């Protein structure tokens, strides 16, 4: 038996397999219940007593070496398979950098989360809109400057004609108009999205940017309700110590209208170059929905009232992360975008 064991030891040391099928055949040959090693184990009971210790040690050595060799070959195959699967011959020779969320997406999601906790749902609408939903339904006069081609992008029907009633939306208020058109109060929505203006691109203006507008319509909605929402939003977005102030303003779709400032988050309201020494920074416009807007969209203004507010996401991002050039948000400069990895 010792001679047979030595023969198997030599065989096992030289085991090779070209593929997984050959490896499985070797395992069956040596380690299965009917394999060569188990046959020797069965014959062990016939070994003379004086040889049992020596033969037993050799049998254990044989079994251990067979298991180790089979395991080694299996590991080599798995490593080889993984290497082949991971190899991508089209991959660039330069390191691949993992992407992160864009700073505008980070801030947009923060805004959505705040209003979601206040019971607002998200509404969406087309970026290519008609005059009705962008201007008429929002109480813009026929001669309002926003209707002029110097301020708005109009869609060309063909080379000879420009369709005056189809535009790239200038604000997400068009989503509010569609919501009022197809829903009955109570309405409580926010409208995040991209908008377009015919502007010269500079550090403080761009031809496209992003807005979030909010609309709440129900019975007995008051300006006090609006103010409470604004204060909560400011504290959630910029910190618990943030103060707000409201200044009278004008918007075609709200009456009364106001612009909201927050205490400067850089100097704490003490005055600095960023806030031009005033201690305050403007962040959004708001007001009570004009009765004409309600009526134009099929809502009885004698029964229902509401408030609306709108802010530029770029503006909020500028204030939150102190970015002073709007163009950075659309240039895809990875050096700039990587600065926001911690916020992801």
Curated annotation (Swiss-Prot):
Places the protein is found: Cytoplasm
Segments forming a coiled coil: none
Entry superkingdom: Bacteria
Reactions the enzyme catalyzes: tRNA(Phe) + L-phenylalanine + ATP = L-phenylalanyl-tRNA(Phe) + AMP + diphosphate + H(+)
Disulfide bonds listed in the record: none
NCBIfam families: pheS (TIGR00468)
Protein name: Phenylalanine--tRNA ligase alpha subunit
Originating species: Phocaeicola vulgatus (strain ATCC 8482 / DSM 1447 / JCM 5826 / CCUG 4940 / NBRC 14291 / NCTC 11154) (Bacteroides vulgatus)
